[in-house]
């Protein structure tokens, strides 16, 4: 049995804890608020500010974990190097977590060091620099904070008149006090995918069937598997994913995102060194092993005999229309649970914000079925659940 310190206790962490419990592991779930989803299924829990390096060190010394598994990005990530030097396994590695937290570090690694195809980009430390970069890149363009998550601070800028708002919005959405943004060429893509990639301690890099997804404001709204893409494009994406994960080092599951263009091919977008929100579709039984089980096996060094597509699947999120500190209630469960070949997952978040992700609907069908129809079904059913 390993003692695992989980940093971040959202819905992805909750599913990881469930997988870990089924393998007899001991989990300490941490977050900045009490009653977070993963805490509800963990052995122990801690509530503290994970951006506070001293507090993070205190918790690590208190529990002396064998493994630290970051589940979110709002962590004092540079401290992970120290824990790794002390002999604690950081997942997938301290290097990976630090690089992927910073869009500057990961983009320069991908584009300049590894030669992966990406959108053209510049950095801006002031509004003037942002205006200069936009003039070079042209409109529309995408502006993002160097450090943020779930689309925070991200905007699509269609004209010079919108740049001042994009600058303020980006800085306000940035982690900490960093006032530097990345401005990117807008790629006219036909689709975007997540390629769940598994790096192992003792074994080859493995890939899950590609997952298509739709985002709004940089945040996941629906996903489906398998995404139908050109085999040559899939091979190109797999090669890029293997290159970047090998450079970042470590064992675990990664969510590697790509833009696909029929005209211009495959563009590397970004990656997360952990299970991915779009990968929740694997909870519909689309694969023999879902993304959380794969992450756990890679972390523990357990064998993964292979990844097989068992059936097709689609997911659609359930969002809160309200903000309240009261525990949320849900209408429509009877209707949803009466649907065939459908799972409902309520995450158990103790309070709501407007557009906060509160649950997900998962639909499945045999291989070869109509995937577009399944996507429509998942969205239709998700709309039946009312958060109040």
From Swiss-Prot:
Pathway: Purine metabolism; IMP biosynthesis via de novo pathway; N(2)-formyl-N(1)-(5-phospho-D-ribosyl)glycinamide from N(1)-(5-phospho-D-ribosyl)glycinamide (formate route): step 1/1. Keywords: ATP-binding, Ligase, Magnesium, Metal-binding, Nucleotide-binding, Purine biosynthesis. One of its GO terms (cellular component) is cytosol. N(1)-(5-phospho-beta-D-ribosyl)glycinamide binds at residues 11-12, 71, 277, 349, 356-357. It is an enzyme of class 6 (ligase). Residues 108-300 form the ATP-grasp domain. Mg(2+) binds at residues 257, 270. InterPro entries: ATP-grasp (IPR011761), ATP-grasp_carboxylate-amine (IPR003135), ATP_grasp_subdomain_1 (IPR013815), PreATP-grasp_dom_sf (IPR016185), PurT (IPR005862), PurT/PurK_preATP-grasp (IPR054350), PurT_C (IPR048740), Rudment_hybrid_motif (IPR011054). Homodimer. NCBIfam families: PRK09288.1. This is Formate-dependent phosphoribosylglycinamide formyltransferase. It comes from Bacteroides fragilis (strain YCH46). The gene is purT.
């Amino acid at each position: 049995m390993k003692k695992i310190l989980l940093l971040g206790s959202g819905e992805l962490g909750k599913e990881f804890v469930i997988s870990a419990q089924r393998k007899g592991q001991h989990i300490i779930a941490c977050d900045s608020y009490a009653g977070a989803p993963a805490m509800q299924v963990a052995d122990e829990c801690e509530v503290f500010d994970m951006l506070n390096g001293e507090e993070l060190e205190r918790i690590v010394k208190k529990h002396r974990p064998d493994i630290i598994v970051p589940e979110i990005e709002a962590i004092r990530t540079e401290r992970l190097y120290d824990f790794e030097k002390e002999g604690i396994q950081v997942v997938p590695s301290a290097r990976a977590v630090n690089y992927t937290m910073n869009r500057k570090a990961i983009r320069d690694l991908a584009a300049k060091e590894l030669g992966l195809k990406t959108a053209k980009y510049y950095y801006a430390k002031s509004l003037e620099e942002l205006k200069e970069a936009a003039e070079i890149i042209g409109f529309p363009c995408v502006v993002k904070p160097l450090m943020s998550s779930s689309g925070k601070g991200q905007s699509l800028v269609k004209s010079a008149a919108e740049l001042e708002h994009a600058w303020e919005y980006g800085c306000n959405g940035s982690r900490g006090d960093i006032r530097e943004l990345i401005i990117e060429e807008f790629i006219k893509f036909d689709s975007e995918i997540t390629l769940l990639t598994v790096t192992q301690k003792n074994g080859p890099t493995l890939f899950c069937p590609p997952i298509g997804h739709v985002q709004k404001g940089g945040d996941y709204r629906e996903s489906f598997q398998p995404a139908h893409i050109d085999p040559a494009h899939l091979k190109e994406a797999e090669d890029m994913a293997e290159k970047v994960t090998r450079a970042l080092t470590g064992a675990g599951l990664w969510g590697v995102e790509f833009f696909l263009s029929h005209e211009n091919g495959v563009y590397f977008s970004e990656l997360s060194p952990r299970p991915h929100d779009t990968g929740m579709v694997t909870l519909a039984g689309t694969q023999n092993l879902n993304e959380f089980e794969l992450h756990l096996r890679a972390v523990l060094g357990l064998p993964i005999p292979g990844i097989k597509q068992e059936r097709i699947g689609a997911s659609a999120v359930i969002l809160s229309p309200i903000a309240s500190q009261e525990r949320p209630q849900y209408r429509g469960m009877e209707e949803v649970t009466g649907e065939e070949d459908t799972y409902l997952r309520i995450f158990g978040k103790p309070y709501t914000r407007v557009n906060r992700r509160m649950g997900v609907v998962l639909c499945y069908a045999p291989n070869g079925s109509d995937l577009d129809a399944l996507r429509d079904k998942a969205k239709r059913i998700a709309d039946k659940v009312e958060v109040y």
